[in-house]
Amino acid sequence: MKKLSGWQKVGLFAGVGCFSIIAIAVVGFAIAVAYARSTLANLGDTTPKRVERSIALPGTTAEAPDPTVKPGTAKSGAETTSGGPMKLALELQEGTFVIKPGAAGSRVEVEGEFSEALYTLTEQTDTVGGSTRTTVRFRSKAPAWARMLAGVGNGDDNRPRLTVSIPTGVPIDLSLNVSMGESRIDLGGLTLSELGLDLAMGNHEVDFKEPVAGGMERFRLNARMGNVSVENLGNARAKSIDTSGSMGNVTADLGGEWRQGSEAELSFTQSMGEVRLSVPTKVRLEADVRDSNGKHESRGADADQTTDPKAPLLRVRVSTSMGESRVTRY
């Protein structure tokens, strides 16, 4: 048998070494997955089960809803005993979430499927500055590394799914935080005075399918590490809209039923992502757009814009860095 040359020996040893490293990595990964699944199993039954929860909003008095009142036009179903809006905070992590308007009344309804061994759903009521605040939290009990490794090969079958129904007819200051998941949010028809949305690490769809009741003073949206779309923003009827984001794209349709004769200030600030706005011609627009290249564009009325002096006036400011911005009319 011919002896191997020096370079051949080096090549042989290198090949054996690479194969050994790959084999060790595969075996190590398999052991890590098995250990992660064992860790989760020690917490209890990891099979998702149906869960339903009804959470009362303190400080409200329930009334029978008035069937003659159209959603988004007047308050019905419940009112606060303190005379001011209720403060409701939803903090949702790691799942697929649907937030929508519920029946008139004084209760937040939560339903969905998840393993109570792996996730926890809690509620808490505090008094802050003389106002009552109810906080609903959904989060994981298990370590992040264990959930990630144990989910290898399982698809989305065990992913938590939760639907939260917010009662109509109750004046609410709403704070909604969704992270490490996906959400479909419809807040149309609710009675909102202030709204704060913090959406991170996932794709999120926000809609106002019906006008909110009363008049919202301020709508704040913060988006990070994900894509966010907003539909029918005019139905929010907010006097001030402040949107900021990073590492993702924001798409907003400014259609909807803005109040006749109203004026609104809208600000969109984005870094490492795009901002795309669609504005109907039935509203008056004053746009100040600045992109990452320092290009500045001021837009006023165009040929198709309404000439009605009582049409809603939107003052829009857009600023992007490391991304593009676009404002289109329809």
Q: What do the predicted segments below correspond to?
A:
Residues K2-T120, A142-P171, D186, H204-E205, ...:
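Short acidic/polar N-terminal linker immediately downstream of export determinants
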Residues P67, A103, E109-F114, Y119-T122, ...:
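Short, surface-exposed interaction patches in beta-rich subdomains
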Residues T125-F138, N158, T168, L197:
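Glycine- and small hydrophobic-enriched segments that form the cores of compact globular domains
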Residues S175-G214:
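Right-handed parallel beta-helix
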